[in-house]
Amino acid sequence: MTLLWTPEELAEATGAAPPPAGASGVSIDSRTLEPGELFVALRAARDGHGFVADALAKGAAIAMVDHVPEGVGAGAPLLLVPDTLAGLGALGRAARARSRAGFVAVTGSVGKTTVKEMLRHGLSAIGPTHASAASYNNQWGVPLTLARTPRDARFAVVEIGMNRRGEIAPLARMTAPQVAVITAVAAVHLGPLGSLEAIAEEKGDILEGALPGGVAVLPQDSPFFPRLAARAEARGLAVVGFGEGPGATARLRDVALGAETVSAIVELSGAHLPLRLPAPGRHMALNATAAIAAASALGADPGRVAAALAFFRPVEGRGRRVPIRVPGGEALLLDESYNCSPVALRAALAVLAAAPATRRIAVIGDMLELGEAGPALHVEVARDAALSADLVFTCGPLTRLLHEALPEEKRGAHAADSEVLAALLPPLLRAGDAVLVKGSLGMRMARVVQALKETAR
């Protein structure tokens, strides 16, 4: 077994006494833990100390704890620290310090997980690449990603998210990337932050962690580009703007939107790189442009990265296309269930509008964390929904406003929550339908997706 962390490294990083063994990996979930890994008992919604005994029984080499949990013997292999989240952070910083990989950090109001996955996919064609799992982008997800960085990684891609002001900067400093990417500044988390200007300021904090002499990949077409570029230059970073405008360093051109694909040309450093993605939507092409620019900034061949993206598959819940069997044939499910904002919903509706279908159905849950602007933003998007869909189903108190703003012939059912729609929708589908499911994470729209997969027969 190859050790990711030796006993001595664990002790040096955390300041704890050396444990009796090293670890082949790092886990915070006893359900998915692999034998030989370090289990970190985080205090979250459920206290991880209650699962230490289970983790050790499943083969954990060590458990990081802040006390000896009940039911765990004094001789158990424990790494005792004052605070397990701080201990995980110490491992993350130590992993970053020892790694020789090229690090890229990605944030943004929309598209960050997709860009992260595009970078994972494209850079893997060049060399060993490590990246954040799922959307592990918060105060425990970032240090966990860093602590898991393989010793032989050539590239590492770290996603950084936020819910409140002041969360990005410390995670960016911990990551210390050579390349920092901001995908977009949009009305997401508008409630907690209060304005687009505050959102831009918070997203720009990723630049505070970037290493001097590094590169900032920024959305050229955003009205906040000049402000972000000035911050980057003040940090000693080179600026690469991506977008469709003539001033973009990485410029997306000749976009051809298909029902199931998008193709384009990416102009970068005098080269004209052909791009073809097996995922539709202009927003996907822009995400790919950001990923190609970031990979190039890390020293990867952008042509090879662009070519590799021809085999990219969208992340579950973020644009994945799933054929589902229905009476008389097949329908197409567009799974956008993971999260939602006005700009992301409009992009998804544009994909639905282009889908080859006899009937286009949009299933929309509330867009949360929009603050006082929330009601008006839901009403505004009703026009896009009416133009893109033949029938619109909604759930949640905010989408009731969207529902009421629709032309009567476009109104499907409105429900209080996604559980009701999950029971209602499957019997209504017909062969040839295309169904888009999208809503904020808190609306649990994945229940609708699962119901359509399981019961639409």
What spans do the regions from the language model cover?
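Phosphate-binding loop of NTP-binding sites
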Residues: 87-220, 226-235, 427, 450-457
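Active-site beta-alpha connecting loops in nucleotide-dependent enzymes
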Residues: 43-46, 315-317, 337-414, 440, ...
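Short beta-strands and strand-loop turn motifs
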Residues: 101-107, 130, 181-187, 219, ...
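Residue-level signal for inorganic ion chemistry
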Residues: 10, 37, 55, 91, ...
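A glycine-rich beta-strand to alpha-helix segment
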Residues: 107, 425-453
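Acidic, Mg2+-coordinating active-site environments of NTP-dependent enzymes
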Residues: 69-74, 179-332, 357-358, 383-386, ...
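N-terminal leader/targeting and accessory segments in enzymes
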Residues: 1-90, 94, 354-357, 384-387, ...
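Short acidic-hydrophobic, aromatic-tinged amphipathic segments that line or gate anion-handling sites
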Residues: 79-83, 412-421
